[in-house]
Amino acid sequence: MPTGHRDHLKRKTAPKSWMLDKQGGTFALMPASGPHKKTECIPLGYLISRFLRYASNFKELSIILAEKNIKVNGRVRTNSHFPVGLFDVVSIEKTGEHFRVLYNVHKKFHLHRISSEEASYRLTKVTKKYENQGIPYIVSSCGLSIRFCDPAIDLGYTIKISNETSKVIEYIVPGPDKVIFVSRGKARGRVGVINTISTQGKETVYGMTDFAGNTFSCTSKSCILIGESSENIWITLPKERGIRQSELEKINAQLGEMIDTEVAEVSE
């Protein structure tokens, strides 16, 4: 049976992070080839129509994009299939709005409103480092190749990239007390401060504590650094600040603290 690139995507097999309803049709937008993996991105058309609700049908969406009103990381994008991933900045020229693409604590995509100053940069992780004809290169998780970079930058570092010049502004070195954002796995969308760093086989495991005091862990491949410390975070976070509540905590937040349900010992 012939195999190759698929041009169509069924709605049932689309990533759950897109939050598509099952009865909205048979097919979904297929992300185009671009800077992000197809399992870790969302088409630009869904951000405009389903998240921002600026378009109610494909015709309106096409008009908005054709008028070059939408920018992603400072560049005009007119393709509704363009893949937008974690920490990318979506800007709307006519309204002056800027949004950063994040995951919420339920592992779904979320558009977080940011200021124009914060919209001037994005964060990405260094995944490759090599040298070609004496020129040092680094490759980021968003597919960007940068040459003549600081030789101190190594694999696993987080770099802040200017959306205007595509040059490295700053970088973060992994270590204790650094703030990370989990981008993969069961803890996707959670934010925590690194407490311990251990090695299990070939994997580096971070033990972390979130801003509510809950502890969890993830591998270094599943997260990205977003701050030097809890007081120095490079991006603004949604109101839940990456804290995932348990079912009991959700009920307590809605109905108030529950009474003590411990069973008292019955004396005969």
Curated annotation (Swiss-Prot):
GO terms for biological process: translation. Keywords: Cytoplasm, Ribonucleoprotein, Ribosomal protein, RNA-binding, rRNA-binding. Component of the small ribosomal subunit. GO terms for molecular function: rRNA binding; structural constituent of ribosome. InterPro entries: Rib_uL2_dom2 (IPR014722), Ribosomal_eS4 (IPR000876), Ribosomal_eS4_central_region (IPR013845), Ribosomal_eS4_central_sf (IPR038237), Ribosomal_eS4_N (IPR013843), S4_RNA-bd_sf (IPR036986). PROSITE patterns: S4. It comes from the Eukaryota. One of its GO terms (cellular component) is cytosolic small ribosomal subunit. The lineage of its organism: Eukaryota, Fungi, Fungi incertae sedis, Microsporidia, Unikaryonidae. Belongs to the eukaryotic ribosomal protein eS4 family. HAMAP family: Ribosomal_eS4. It comes from Encephalitozoon cuniculi (strain GB-M1) (Microsporidian parasite). Transmembrane segments: none annotated. The keyword Repressor does not apply. Its main location: cytoplasm. Residues 42-105 form the S4 RNA-binding domain. The gene is RPS4. This is Small ribosomal subunit protein eS4. The keyword Repressor does not apply. Coiled coil: none annotated. It is found in: Cytoplasm.
